[in-house]
């Protein structure tokens, strides 16, 4: 079989390499990055393709009649037309669970950056202002203790559940809004509520769901209006969940105290985004999944998915 890697940059950090994949499919062509217009020509007559964010849709599939398997080097499938792949007989495999701990960790990294103001005070010390008294430009910013605060979670998959464990370790009350409440969740010590209750009671609200037809624009202007005044909103899931203009308005009005985000509607975040100029926005460039350990799991599972497909089994297929 012939394979193509369209975004090799994803797995070429540190000690990571594609040797495991190349051992399975010696006839493989690799590209560092691929624009949409080049996707179909580069796949060509290959049966296998590995992607991260490249879009695979009807237009691409119609030009790649030999394609049999798409390996997503990620968990999310927003960029794949799964139904079109099914019609064309193309199996799509993703990598579930590889970044659970890393994304939950980033969620609290954002929250702690907000609550402790550590970066601002670090700068004050390094600039020598501690000896002089911290001046107004650094601000004696109020720090926030998490003990006893209410932490709301929308979406209770593996990442949401791990985030709940961390919140409870900080002594927070945890509320969860999720589509399905499973019997196994009974021992988690969280309270399951509807969306309006989640909005009204959460001091901190963290999003942990995929972007679907039902969840796109979840944090709309109307939803933000139902939140506690001065609440904190965190998004380490998908940018499409949030109306960023409405969030900017909420930050400017004080309705939201802070917005911590690692995912955005358009990435990289455009220069004209209002979020870039707001002190209440704490932003990172969609890196929650890129810890050394998570990337190694990503590579291992991706290689395993390919090995399974070649053996006729089809592991982690999302469009059976």
Model-identified regions with their sequence ranges:
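Rossmann-like adenosine-cofactor binding region
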Residues: 58-61, 179-274
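Phosphate-binding beta-alpha-beta segment of Rossmann-like dinucleotide-binding domains, i.e.
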Residues: 88, 96-150
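NAD(P)-dependent dehydrogenase/reductase Rossmann-like domain
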Residues: 297-298, 303-320
């Amino acid at each position: 079989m012939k394979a193509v890697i369209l975004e090799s940059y994803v797995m070429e950090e540190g000690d990571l390499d594609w040797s495991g994949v190349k051992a399975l499919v010696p006839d493989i062509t690799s590209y560092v990055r691929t624009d949409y217009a080049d996707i179909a020509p580069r796949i060509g007559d290959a049966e296998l393709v590995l992607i991260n964010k490249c879009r695979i849709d009807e237009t691409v599939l119609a030009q790649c009649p030999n394609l049999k398997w798409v390996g997503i080097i990620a968990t999310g499938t927003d960029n794949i037309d799964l139904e079109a792949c099914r019609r064309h007989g193309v199996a799509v495999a993703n990598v579930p669970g590889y970044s659970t701990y890393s994304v939950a960790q980033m969620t609290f990294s954002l929250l702690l950056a907000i609550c402790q103001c550590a970066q601002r005070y670090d700068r004050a010390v390094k600039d020598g202002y501690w000896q002089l008294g911290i001046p107004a430009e650094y601000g004696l910013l109020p720090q926030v203790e998490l003990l006893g605060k209410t932490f709301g979670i929308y979406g209770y998959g593996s990442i949401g559940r791990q985030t709940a464990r961390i919140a409870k370790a900080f002594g927070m009350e945890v509320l969860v809004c999720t589509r399905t409440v499973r019997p196994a969740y009974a021992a988690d010590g969280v309270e399951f509520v509807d969306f309006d209750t989640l909005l009204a009671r959460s001091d901190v609200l963290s999003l942990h769901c995929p972007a679907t037809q039902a969840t796109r624009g979840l944090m709309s202007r109307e939803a933000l209006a139902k939140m506690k005044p001065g609440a904190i909103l965190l998004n380490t899931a998908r940018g499409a969940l949030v109306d960023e203009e409405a969030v900017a308005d909420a930050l400017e009005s004080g309705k939201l105290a802070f917005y911590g985000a690692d995912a955005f509607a358009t990435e990289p975040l455009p220069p004209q985004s209002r979020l870039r100029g707001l002190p209440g926005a704490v932003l990172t460039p969609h890196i929650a999944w890129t810890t050394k350990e998570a990337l190694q799991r990503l590579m291992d599972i991706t290689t395993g998915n390919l090995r399974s497909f070649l053996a006729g089994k089809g592991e982690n297929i999302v469009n059976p």
